[in-house]
Amino acid sequence: NLFQFEKLIKKSGMLWYSAYGCYCGWGGQGRPKDATDRCCFVHDCCYGKVTGCNPKCGGTNPCKKQICECDRAAAICFRDNLKTYDSKTYWKYPK
């Protein structure tokens, strides 16, 4: 869930990433604007590849593990690309 994801990325997902670039937050189109936006694009694609699952599912089923892996990969991507985060240019960027 979102709270677990925020704990994983050590930032507030709602504050830092909810309206960043073309892919962070709801929806997305076009080319990612920078490496941070690309992390969101890859995260969206990862969720899209998790078949037959709802990101809110719980328990120890494969769905939860696949979603967790998507979130873990995104957290690593955000960490590795934190220097590209440019809120002055890409915050609330038109989607």
Curated annotation (Swiss-Prot):
One MF term in the entry's GO annotations: toxin activity
UniProt record similarity statement: Belongs to the phospholipase A2 family. Group II subfamily. D49 sub-subfamily.
Lipid-substituted positions (N6-palmitoyl lysine): K7, K10
Description of how the protein assembles with itself and partners: Monomer.
Record key words, sorted: Calcium, Disulfide bond, Hydrolase, Lipid degradation, Lipid metabolism, Lipoprotein, Metal-binding, Palmitate, Secreted, Toxin
Compartmental location: Secreted
Tissue-wise expression: Expressed by the venom gland.
Catalytic activity, as annotated: a 1,2-diacyl-sn-glycero-3-phosphocholine + H2O = a 1-acyl-sn-glycero-3-phosphocholine + a fatty acid + H(+)
Pfam families documented for this protein: Phospholip_A2_1
EC number per UniProt: 3.1.1.4
Protein name in the entry: Basic phospholipase A2
